[in-house]
């Protein structure tokens, strides 16, 4: 069985922020629900305070807690997804194409936010993406997979230095 400790040690930021939030609940209540699931906070007031701290963490105003998902932009929704992912103080966060559904202007800000939070919390970030320019910016180590097989792996410097596997080259030129 997966207890709160197991659930909170690994979390995920999904690709599409539009599909990850319940449209009938405020974003604050959704973060509080994640905190309850992870066993964080002994009282409602503790969880409410932690939820506000998480909004601070993802650089959203605290009054966003009362907003409904339909009132948020894609980048703001993704920030709420990031807040929920970090609610349980995870050891590992899997980010599956977390910026691909966002406008290019928002991608850099969300990528930087992920990197800042990862550094601040000393969390391992497994960043899945086809966009190697973002991977190069965010990663210490890179694994390139093609058809389910690892075709290249190493430090960011090693993987981004020629010679490239043909698939890596295709991703770089895309």
Roles of regions detected by a PLM:
Residues 89:
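Conserved catalytic motifs of ABC-family nucleotide-binding domains
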Residues 1-11, 29, 37, 158-163:
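ABC ATPase NBD coupling module
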Residues 135-137:
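A short, surface-exposed alpha-helical micro-motif characterized by mixed small hydrophobic
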Residues 16, 25-37:
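Q-loop/switch helix immediately C-terminal to the Walker
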Residues 68-72, 76:
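Conserved ABC ATPase signature
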Residues 45-63, 172:
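Conserved ABC ATPase "signature" region
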């Amino acid at each position: 069985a997966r207890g709160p400790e197991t659930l909170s040690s690994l979390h995920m930021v999904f690709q599409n922020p539009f599909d990850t939030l319940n449209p009938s609940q405020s974003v604050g209540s959704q973060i509080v629900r994640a905190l309850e699931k992870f066993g964080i906070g002994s009282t409602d007031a503790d969880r409410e305070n932690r939820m506000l701290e998480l909004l601070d963490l993802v650089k959203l105003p605290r009054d966003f807690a009362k907003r409904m998902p339909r009132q948020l932009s894609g980048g703001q929704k993704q920030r709420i997804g990031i807040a929920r992912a970090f609610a349980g103080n995870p050891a590992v966060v899997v980010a599956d194409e977390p910026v691909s559904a966002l406008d290019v202007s928002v991608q850099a800000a969300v990528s930087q936010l992920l990197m800042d939070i990862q550094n601040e919390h000393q969390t391992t970030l497994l960043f899945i993406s086809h966009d190697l320019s973002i991977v190069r910016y965010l990663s210490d180590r890179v694994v390139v997979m093609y058809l389910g097989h690892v075709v290249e792996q190493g430090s960011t410097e090693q993987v981004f230095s020629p010679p490239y596997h043909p698939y890596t080259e295709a991703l770089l030129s895309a």
